[in-house]
Amino acid sequence: MQAHLSHQPCWSSLPSPSVREAASMYGTAVAIFLVILVAALRGSEPPESPFPYHIPLDPEGILELSWNVSYVQEIIHFQLQVQGLRAGVLFGMSDRGEMENADLIMLWTDGDRAYFADAWSDRKGQIHLDSQQDYQLLQAQRTRDGLSLLFKRPFVTCDPKDYVIEDDTVHLVYGILEEPFQSLEAINTSGLHTGLQRVQLLKSEVPTPSMPEDVQTMDIRAPDILIPDNETTYWCYITELPPRFPRHHIIMYEAIVTEGNEALVHHMEVFQCAAESEDFPQFNGPCDSKMKPDRLNYCRHVLAAWALGAKAFYYPKEAGVPFGGPGSSPFLRLEVHYHNPRKIQGRQDSSGIRLHYTATLRRYDAGIMELGLVYTPLMAIPPQETAFVLTGYCTDKCTQMALQDSGIHIFASQLHTHLTGRKVVTVLARDGQERKVVNRDNHYSPHFQEIRMLKKVVTVYPGDVLITSCTYNTENKTLATVGGFGILEEMCVNYVHYYPQTELELCKSAVDDGFLQKYFHMVNRFSSEEVCTCPQASVPQQFSSVPWNSFNRDMLKALYDYAPISMHCNKTSAVRFPGEWNLQPLPKITSTLEEPTPRCPIRQTQSPANPTVPITTEADAE
């Protein structure tokens, strides 16, 4: 049966392309009907289970993505909902969210017929048909508001034009076609309405613990604020626990997003303020506001973190996060990241995080430990670097002193850098050998931060070493980027969530200050430009005067790779464990882990050059 849309004649149902037309497109585009219920490719079945994960792709809510993961088959099923479809849509993935060199699926029309294909874009944004069709269309169905596409793709295709889907951050890209194109090669992404969204596609499948009967909830929400019409806003709000709130365990939390703002609320975090301060000033405004009290910088203890696409976070049945009671600050800071690239005005928001807690304390308190680098300008990244690595250590000496013989069990991790961070990894080493990766994100983005459950719990014993490395890109910088708290300064942190809680709250390092001063003296000696090494000059001032030639860059890398470190092996009171922690040698690692090589799927048959497309049609079900 054939149906027509008078207002969208280009999407009228038509027969599949001829062999000649298919050959001209290198033979793998699939003709589909978009006006009626359209059928699947022969032998393909949509997944039986529902789609557990959903995200809006664009701020207007035109495109919505749902997905389902099969770890056994190593396949993802995608469902793309398109509202008010015009002349087509593209969807895909790229290394950092660029439209160039992207792995894509294309749905487009030439004004007569409609086509679906696996494609890719070159470095100029030109679209090309992929000779290896790894995205398989399963169904295209007309909906009340537009179109629903169901398709699947393996995690790994071993196609050089395809993106390898791993369990780190994925930069999804999308585009909307406003007019027909006579061929796929006539499309360039530069002329399209495009955007990006970040998400973790491959999430850990952890069994959901049952909730106790006495579970209660507490909502930490923004107080009906007006979302600024800026592309990026970090909003801070200080709230307080009820008076004399006793000790409880947080055992689960989930996001509460104001209806209609799903595409604007990017990620949220709840921090507990430092217990040492009896009072914190009230604040409700942008986190970078000049009116923000400096004391809010001491609200850094993460209680909950959510990012777009994340589901509810459950703690292991053995443990819960303590809050309330003696020794715990009643002050909490909510931070909401709004992503508003269209600069939409007049949108009110009361989004936040719902804490589920119980007065029946679990066997263990869950703790949060900071790994990585100390927040100090001693650690810096030269300008114009594409992949500069800084590494922080939690040494065997610290874990030997601070951990019990039974060790601790890390079950979740939140990686953190500021704006120039591109990769983060934490590795556990034992007896001089790297043993396992705690958490890794090779496509890390500072604009997408969440607490991620580990696929397998990592146990850390006394004498183990935890090594956290961050890779930075400062191509657009003219001065060195130093470590610190400011958003234009840098961090390298892994907040690991573990049980049972210990006194060790911070296990981080920085290069020894005396050896850094030797570096500045050496730069003075071999450079025609003078670097101030006088006592009154701050480290940032010294770094700002370094001439960044290749020699000075290489020497700074060597300094960080070999110089002694100052260890911060700190208790919850911010006091170091007793011992000598300055001028400590770097841990000696004799064997390192190699990144696993993706396994290529076994291909039973190759797609024919000019496929015959089986199409079945049904009347519109509405």
Curated annotation (Swiss-Prot):
Required co-factor(s) are: Cu(2+)
> Which ranges of this chain reside in the Cytoplasmic compartment per its record?
1-20
Disulfide linkage: C158-C600, C236-C287, C273-C299, C394-C507, C398-C569, C470-C492
Q: Which GO terms describe its cellular component?
A: centriolar satellite; chromaffin granule lumen; chromaffin granule membrane; endoplasmic reticulum; extracellular space; secretory granule lumen; secretory granule membrane; transport vesicle membrane
* Residues carrying sugar: N68, N188, N476, N570
List each coiled-coil range: none
UniProt KW Methyltransferase keyword: no
Which keywords annotate this record? Catecholamine biosynthesis, Copper, Cytoplasmic vesicle, Disulfide bond, Glycoprotein, Membrane, Metal-binding, Monooxygenase, Oxidoreductase, Phosphoprotein, Signal-anchor, Transmembrane, Transmembrane helix, Vitamin C
Q: Where are the transmembrane segments?
A: 21-41
Any ranges marked Intragranular in the topology annotation, and which? 42-621
Lipid bilayer topology: Single-pass type II membrane protein
Site Cleavage — annotated at G43, S44
Q: What does this protein do?
A: Catalyzes the hydroxylation of dopamine to noradrenaline (also known as norepinephrine), and is thus vital for regulation of these neurotransmitters.
Give the UniProt family note. Answer: Belongs to the copper type II ascorbate-dependent monooxygenase family.
Known partners and oligomeric status: Homotetramer; composed of two disulfide-linked dimers.
Official protein name in the record? Dopamine beta-hydroxylase
Which organism was this protein described from? Mus musculus (Mouse)
Q: Which gene encodes it?
A: Dbh
